[in-house]
Amino acid sequence: MIRKTSAEILSLVWDWIRTTPLYEAVPTMYLDHFPTSASHKLSGEFIVLTTLSNVIGEQQVATVNVNIYVPDTTPRINKEEQRYPDNNRLSELTKIAYDSLRCYPLDERYFFDVLDESLISEAEIPYTLSNIKVQLKNY
């Protein structure tokens, strides 16, 4: 049985997302990390795909992070700018991601499913992300 590399798995998830309502909602995607150069200032919502693990044994099991970044809201309270997650938008996009990534077969031997999800606030940038772990299994 031919096993898939991490790069091949990322490509499969990337290609799949581009066909789903998640991509319609958030069409800006990056592999491995978001741009950090001064010439590319972050704006709006975006998705970053990374691999966590790719265990190749009798059964191949790989985990991919699908991170959906949403800008924080920044209201002023007592003339001080505050940062708060946009929980409504994070919830909306996470539900779209669940529906887009849940239980889909790649071919007769590979199957992806949502494993878990958590919210993470970024300290260096004014974003909160929905970190969705998607697991590929080969049967």
Where are these regions (language model features)?
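Charged, amphipathic alpha-helical segments and their flanking helix caps
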Residues: M1-V26, T50-Y139
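A short acidic/basic microdomain associated with nuclease active sites
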Residues: A25-S37
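A short beta-turn/loop motif at secondary-structure boundaries
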Residues: T36-K41, S121-I125
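A short, hydrophobic beta-strand-centered structural micro-motif
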Residues: K41-T51
